[in-house]
């Protein structure tokens, strides 16, 4: 067998074959002939699949035949249970679902997953405690879990949701916004109760102030009635000699007592009105005082503009000279 000649192109050797004489002659004839022309053409693409492709798709849609390929590489834990043995220890528990046969029904798959995960957790707990002080308590807990798993294997505990009663009501999970709204209702109801208590306290204070005003008025009327009775007694019957020196003292105390009583009633009324008015009255008084101060300040500034300092000093010197001359005289 003859080797094809090699040509060096840089550092790469390319092996080329011999060109046929017919192809060279055909190329030269096409290039030499000026009458030949090239035309572009369109090739239509198929819009739909061919009948054979359609038939193959229909065949693939059907259920495939049962194959023994799915059963390869699986170990049976026991013949009676029908469940597979635990996966390898290196397989993490969150990937157990990948090793469960897809041919099983959903209840059996969840049962298989529950058995695998529980067995793996028991083994981890056994390695964790070992011979520690809590080993005996952990062993008791593991024995209880193992009994539950044995009952699950013996089909004494059912995890199938197909056998539940048809009228069973499944509670819906509460919406997070509803939980927040319930919490807000509790907070606002507590706030409303506090406000009601404050309102009741203020109403009690107001009722006490009104009752105190009424008691003062009734006391004042009683004093006036007593004074009127005493005046009538003075006019009708003379006083005994023992009470004669005390008359001037009582007559002197009467006007003071009336004035003190009026001042007390006025102060109580003022305090009550200020308590009811609250911060609005204080803010209004402060606003008026600030306005008066600003107006007074502006008037002083405007007056100082028109006053001449030299004339002011001259007037002060004349006043001091006149006062000194008057003192010398």
From Swiss-Prot:
What protein am I looking at?
A: Kinetochore protein mis13
Q: Which PANTHER family match?
A: KINETOCHORE-ASSOCIATED PROTEIN DSN1 HOMOLOG (PTHR14778:SF2)
On the tree of life, the source organism's domain of life is: Eukaryota
* Main function: Acts as a component of the NMS (Ndc80-MIND-Spc7) super complex which has a role in kinetochore function during late meiotic prophase and throughout the mitotic cell cycle. Required for correct segregation of chromosomes and for maintaining the inner centromere structure.
UniProt region (Disordered), positions on chain:
1-81, 228-249
**Subunit structure and binding partners:** Component of the NMS super complex which consists of mis12, mis13, mis14, ndc80, nnf1, nuf2, sos7, spc7, spc24 and spc25. Interacts with dis1, mal2, mis14, ppe1 and ekc1.
Enumerate composition-biased segments (Basic residues).
Answer: 15-27
Q: Which UniProt keywords apply?
A: Cell cycle, Cell division, Meiosis, Mitosis, Nucleus
The UniProt regions of compositional bias labelled Basic and acidic residues, in chain numbering, are 55-73
Give a yes or no for keyword Cell cycle in this entry.
Answer: yes
The answer on whether this UniProt entry bears the keyword NADP reads no
Its GO CC terms are: condensed chromosome, centromeric region; kinetochore; MIS12/MIND type complex; nucleus
